[in-house]
């Protein structure tokens, strides 16, 4: 199982059966399909790219073509049981504003992100003196969509600043998956490649 | 059965029951002219109702009896097309108030044997939909798989979903609005004033003289036609090109291709459209405001709906812009409805929904197929 699949299955494990879910940046609708099948959710997606929206619509998913940076205002407060932002927060222009919007819209929010504090990333930067290129972060700095990369510690700090409650954290690398009640241990900022957070206001 | 009434060969339904209008007035009996394509399946579950726009009619995918041209949505409706007539039973009816066989101001008033003209009651989008519902029931259809329409057709779609959600599985409003804006009303008023300023209009009673206000109607059409295009599409198609000449004529003939094109649009329109129908139908659109008709806000109107929605807008449409369509999406989302939305990238203006837009075809095909297969 590759890390991407681990990321999806961790998210699925945090979603309650039959809940109303919004997947922000839903892509081809892979996660929504997975959630519909496994958790019988009532799912909705938000996706900016036309071809991806079409794929979702053809699969019978309900998806709105829009931009997470401005179209989240479409949704009233607490209009979803769960709002998911999977591997996208680091690619948004204003992560802080987006996170606040997600918390406003969802009773619960799930955010997954690549950990820039992972030891391989650190080592890569230390040894080469250049922006790290790893399996997970595989594009040059001038090409990558990831304009706001952060570490697990950075994200936890942002949640503290916004008074967002971390209910659960799942961290993983190619070898292990770990689940923490509330925040992860400090060492995870070094040994985890990715993290999934379950948040509430 | 298709019959030939007033040289319009299509199917007709004579509704013997009075139709009470939104205004409180009543039409005692009326006729609806319609076309169908494909076959109704055993469970009567494969119907797609297409609602036409202001200048459209029931000939969505068949040869027009007056112009001889192909159907206005030929590219979308037919075997192997997104609205696949091998799979779906397609119904398209001329709207109440229209002039292609359905009862309207050019029809004969059975009470006095004269043409209705302005004695025809003012109708609304809700009245048009109520007449369609009667037709659908007459055809023995309990539930429509999808109701789809662009522009004024989209208003009918919204009205169907607001008034008769249990009669539908899905609704596809395209390039439309939940209420006519001041700009929309303004352009319609230009058209109406052009018709009424034509001396041949005769206070609406031109049927007595046998000369219809073609000048006024063609100007109305020319004005409206510009609103269906975009600066980009006009520039691409015409630019400042001259019509059949090398130099400016220093006069007021059609020097530019765009002028000649518009004049042609106006002239051909009057052959197939009735001036009074144009007044009545534009009025119905102007009066359209779902919140006023239903005395609730948009979100409340759709609260609890089980219908699936696909809302479609086009980036280059300035008449029914993306923002207007997004208002519908916003309300449906807030109401907890199952809604998809696409904003098709196009520079063709409002008419884009009638033109070649492959992404629109793909979206529609995907949505309809998934709704169809969800019925098992």
Where are these regions (language model features)?
Chain A
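Alpha-helix C-terminal capping/helix-to-coil transition sites in glycosyltransferase folds
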Residues: 17, 78-79, 105
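Class I SAM-dependent methyltransferase "Motif I" SAM/SAH-binding loop
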Residues: 25-27
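Conserved alpha-helix/loop element of class I SAM-dependent methyltransferases that forms part
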Residues: 2-18
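A short SAM/SAH-binding and catalytic strip from SAM-dependent methyltransferases
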Residues: 82-94
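A short acidic, Gly/Pro-enriched loop at the edge of an enzyme's catalytic core
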Residues: 73-82
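Class I SAM-dependent methyltransferase SAM/SAH-binding core
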Residues: 30, 34-71
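S-adenosyl-L-methionine-dependent methyltransferase catalytic module, highlighting the catalytic core
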Residues: 97-101, 108-201
